[in-house]
Amino acid sequence: MDQKPDERVQSHRCELLDLPWEDVLVSHVFCHLPLRLLVSLQRVSKSFRSLIQVYLDNCRTFDPAQTGPHIPREAFCSILRHNQVLQHLSVTNCSDWITDTDLLPVIGQNQQLQHVDLRGCAQLSRRALVAVSLSCPRLQHLSLAHCEWVDSLALRSLADHCPMLRSLDLTACRQLKDPAVCYLAGKCPELRALSVAVNANITDTAVEEVAKKCREMERLDLTGCLRVRNEAIRTLAEYCPKLQSLKVNHCHNVTESSLGVLRRRNVEIDVEPPLQRALVLLQDVVGFAPFINLQI
C-alpha cells in the first residue's frame, strides 16, 4: 500500500543528532560555532550534552575569549576535564582567578600543546612554567608577559625541554637577568620572536648572545631595556640578517648610529629617525613644520 505524502516526508526526515557526530558535526559544524553557544547547547537535552562533550574532548583550541570576558573556574575545569588533544591554550581571560591547581591538570594531560598563552596570570607560580616545560616538548609559542613569578630556574627548565620554541614573550618578567636569557639563546637557536621588554636587568650581554645564537631572529622587543647600548644593536645587525622588526623605545643609550644600519635594510623600528622626530616636535610646538625647507 502506497504511503501518503506526509508519511513519506516523515520517514525521510533527518534530525541534527542523526548525523554522524565526530565525522560531521564535530569536524565540520561545531568548529565554526562560538564556544559560548556550544556550552549553552548543553542545556537542550541529555543527547546534546553528550554531543557537546564529544566536541570539547576533541577540541584542538581553547580560548576563553570565545565564552565572554570572564569564564568561571567551574566552567573552565568542566570544559577541559577530559581533553587530551589541545594544541592551542589561552587562559588570559582567566587571569583573575587561575592558579596552579586549575592549570596543571590541563597541562599534564595535553602533551601536544604548541601554543600557550599565560599573559597576566599573576596567581600562577614557577611550577606552572616547569609543568609546561616537562609536559609540552612540541611547544613553539609561549607568552609569559607580565608574569613576574617567572624566574631563572624556571626559564632554564623551559630552555632544556622545549628546543622547538619559535616565539617567547617575557615582557616585564623582571626577575630574569642576563645569564638566564643567554642560557635560553644557547638552547633555543630556532627562536624567531623574543620580547624581554620592560626589564632593566637586561644588558648588551644578553642581546649580543641572542644575536649570535638565534640567527633566525625576526622580531625582537627591547622596549624599556635601559641598559642596552649601541654595541648590542650593531651585533644584532651583524648576526641576524632575517631581522624584520626591532623595538627600542625608551632605550636611551641606543642611537641612530646603530639603528641606521638596520633602517637601510628596511627593518621596522619603533623609533623615528632624528630628523623625523625633530619635524614632529616642531609641528606640535609651532604648527609650521611642513613648510620648513629641508635643503637649507
UniProtKB/Swiss-Prot annotation:
Indicate where this protein resides in the cell: Cytoplasm
Q: Which Pfam families match?
A: F-box (PF00646)
SMART domains associated with the record: LRR_CC (SM00367)
The record, for Gene3D superfamilies, names:
Ribonuclease Inhibitor
What residue stretches are annotated with the F-box domain? 16-63
Q: What is its main location?
A: cytoplasm
Q: Which UniProt keywords apply?
A: Cytoplasm, Leucine-rich repeat, Repeat, Ubl conjugation pathway
Cellular-component GO terms for this entry:
cytoplasm; SCF ubiquitin ligase complex
**Pathway membership:** Protein modification; protein ubiquitination
- Point out the coiled-coil segments of this chain: none
Q: What does the record give as the function of this protein?
A: Substrate recognition component of a SCF (SKP1-CUL1-F-box protein) E3 ubiquitin-protein ligase complex which mediates the ubiquitination and subsequent proteasomal degradation of target proteins. Acts as a positive regulator of the BMP signaling pathway. Required for dorsal/ventral pattern formation.
- What interactions and quaternary structure are annotated? Part of the SCF (SKP1-CUL1-F-box) E3 ubiquitin-protein ligase complex SCF(FBXL15).
Q: Which family does it belong to?
A: Belongs to the FBXL15 family.
Q: What is this protein called?
A: F-box/LRR-repeat protein 15
Q: Please tell me the species this chain comes from.
A: Danio rerio
Q: What is the lineage of its organism?
A: Eukaryota, Metazoa, Chordata, Craniata, Vertebrata
Q: Which gene encodes it?
A: fbxl15
